[in-house]
């Protein structure tokens, strides 16, 4: 492999390609003369679109093939949406860089309604996320919620075809693809607490590849990396996956980190919420502490029920 070239493994979806191109542009900006090549791959999560992610193995399905590509020497790094990255990294891989977070919020998208509360009785809502389903059903138990898979363009097309009254997507994905005008309302964390890592991109590479780690290091955004340490530590304590409705969102409040988290049942009937504040230097400890508090207050039982 030439020292002046990097190959980025990426999924083929428009959003994944945008994210990889964004990282490629940043790498070229920091390293003039560096050749950056995209290596598109199809993952199992992209191929199986007729089932909910929670039924076929979770978000790790979107990254395993990319990791295999790095192991086999076909790529040097991979770019991921951090909300898709499991809390436990596989042996032999590192996550050295987290780029500056875009917006972390969920977006309510509808052609006829401005907000969730405006949907008619028994309205049809589409989402691919148990976390979003849980919080929407808690607010509107009457809604019919169905699994909505596929890339952003596919999901919008299903809404436009009348299959749903509204859908909920990540605001960052819509914005990155130029679909800001489709957002009826950005949902504040108080209404729809984001997924762990939502809105941030991460770079994964082989743990032993010092060359790649040095080249990507300038792209790391320390403040975002610290916040995600808190969120991911909470998720690690909960041993969360996308089979479980878990949300976690950290932000800065003065000189402290404010971390909010929740664990719920898919039907929204049970939700355990919690929050902690503490020193920035203790980000991981704060996340671990909040995870423990949620477990003690009922999350352990919810998680056990979902595992059965």
Swiss-Prot record:
Pathway: Porphyrin-containing compound metabolism; protoporphyrin-IX biosynthesis; coproporphyrinogen-III from 5-aminolevulinate: step 2/4. One of its GO terms (cellular component) is cytoplasm. Monomer. The lineage of its organism: Bacteria, Pseudomonadati, Pseudomonadota, Gammaproteobacteria, Chromatiales. The gene is hemC. This is Porphobilinogen deaminase. GO terms for biological process: protoporphyrinogen IX biosynthetic process. It comes from Alkalilimnicola ehrlichii (strain ATCC BAA-1101 / DSM 17681 / MLHE-1). Its cofactor is dipyrromethane. The keyword Transferase applies. Binds 1 dipyrromethane group covalently. Coiled coil: none annotated. One of its GO terms (molecular function) is hydroxymethylbilane synthase activity. It is an enzyme of class 2 (transferase). The keyword Transferase applies. It catalyses: 4 porphobilinogen + H2O = hydroxymethylbilane + 4 NH4(+). The modification S-(dipyrrolylmethanemethyl)cysteine is found at residue 242. Tetrapolymerization of the monopyrrole PBG into the hydroxymethylbilane pre-uroporphyrinogen in several discrete steps.
